[in-house]
């Protein structure tokens, strides 16, 4: 093989590995307002005038193991939880293989199995639309659950770690830096962040957050990088342990702690090819959760919303109370005339118009 053939071979190999387009930074402005559907709404969805929150949304590091948002309706004969999916986007063979590899890694390390959809009413739809970036909703909502993985000659979400990250959102994981204990591990530099982006750095109280006592993990595939949503030339986060400053947000794969939290959500019998109960006992993972019933939460003659997005959905006329009453009791019970509306109604071409079918 002469030098020209060798160089051509290297170029072709790199092209196949990198796929189409440049990598989309899921933690930057180029990816829209967030890679989580519930955080992609207008900034007024959560009201912030400072790093101190003015009202408390119900966000968690990981879903409770008895959350109604788990994919718990279907199991196979081995007790694995099934998430039906369809790939409706246009992807090439290499990209489809990358998506399938990400699914296989999750299956090999947890009790979650992503299976091709037949006629199941609740499912994940993996789609590819130019200009949409990478995003997914947290947990299972009725009907279609969008997993947007844009890929074209300009830019792409199809890297194994990014696909795993978005699938973990669907399964039930939020971002690592949102944990209640994050201040012991990182400093969020609010002076370097536009106020409209403060919701991306919401810290949860220990009463709200569920970490299952799994240690904070700089290597998590769910961790933001140091520049996430920062002003140009600035960083938004500084790690307390300096050797991890350039590590956060740059994983090549899910960490063992990521898999442990998924296993905790679904009470898997096996986790990373080990008996999960042994892992629980050895690492003191906490599986006990507050009881969540399937009925609306009643307080006297009133009831409360169990999802922080309920008021926003109602104000946008996107709240379908036939299917969401269990989660949005207060918003569904309140007269429409008393609902606080938000200025700046989205146009027909806005993101919320495009994704509102998720909630209907």
Swiss-Prot record:
Secretion signal span: 1-21
Alphabetically ordered keywords of this record: Disulfide bond, Glycoprotein, Hydrolase, Metal-binding, Metalloprotease, Protease, Secreted, Signal, Zinc, Zymogen
Active-site residues annotated for this sequence: 166
GO biological process, one term: nematode pharynx development
Domain Peptidase M12A: 61-269
Binding site for Zn(2+): 165, 169, 175
Domain PLAC: 299-336
Residues linked to a glycan: 108
GO molecular function, one term: zinc ion binding
InterPro entries, alphabetized: Astacin-like_dom, MetalloPept_cat_dom_sf, Peptidase_M12A, Peptidase_Metallo, PLAC
Described function: Metalloprotease.
Protein name: Zinc metalloproteinase nas-5
Taxonomic path: Eukaryota, Metazoa, Ecdysozoa, Nematoda, Chromadorea
């Amino acid at each position: 093989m002469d030098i020209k053939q060798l160089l051509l071979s290297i170029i072709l190999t790199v092209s196949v590995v990198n796929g189409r387009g440049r990598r989309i930074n899921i933690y930057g402005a180029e990816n829209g307002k967030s890679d989580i559907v519930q955080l992609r709404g207008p900034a007024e969805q959560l009201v912030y005038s400072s790093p101190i929150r003015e009202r408390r949304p119900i966000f968690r590091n990981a879903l409770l193991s008895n959350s109604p948002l788990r994919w718990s309706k279907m199991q196979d004969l081995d007790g694995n939880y099934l998430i039906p999916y369809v790939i409706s986007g246009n992807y090439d063979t290499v990209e489809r293989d990358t998506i399938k590899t990400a699914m296989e890694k999750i299956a090999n390390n947890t009790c979650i199995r992503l299976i091709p959809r037949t006629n199941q009413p609740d499912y994940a739809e993996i789609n590819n639309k130019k200009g949409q970036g990478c995003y997914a909703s947290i947990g299972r909502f009725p009907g279609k659950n969008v997993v947007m993985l844009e890929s074209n000659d300009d830019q792409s979400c199809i890297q194994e770690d990014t696909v795993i990250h978005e699938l973990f959102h669907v399964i039930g994981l939020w971002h690592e830096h949102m944990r209640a204990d994050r201040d012991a591990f990182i400093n969020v530099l609010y002076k370097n962040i536009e106020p409209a982006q403060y919701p991306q750095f919401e810290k949860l109280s220990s009463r709200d957050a569920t970490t299952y006592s799994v240690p904070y993990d700089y290597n998590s595939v769910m961790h933001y990088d140091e520049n996430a949503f920062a002003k140009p030339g600035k960083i938004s986060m500084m790690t307390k342990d300096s050797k991890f400053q350039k590590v956060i947000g740059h994983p090549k794969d899910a960490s063992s702690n990521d898999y442990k939290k998924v296993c905790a959500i679904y009470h898997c019998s096996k986790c990373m090819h080990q008996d999960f109960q042994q892992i629980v006992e050895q690492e003191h993972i906490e599986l006990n959760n507050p009881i969540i019933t399937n009925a609306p939460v009643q307080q006297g003659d009133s009831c409360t919303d169990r999802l922080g997005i309920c008021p926003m959905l109602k104000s946008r006329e996107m709240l379908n109370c036939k299917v969401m009453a269990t989660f949005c009791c207060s918003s569904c019970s309140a007269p429409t005339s008393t609902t606080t509306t938000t200025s700046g109604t989205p146009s027909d071409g806005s993101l919320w118009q495009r994704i509102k079918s998720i909630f209907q």
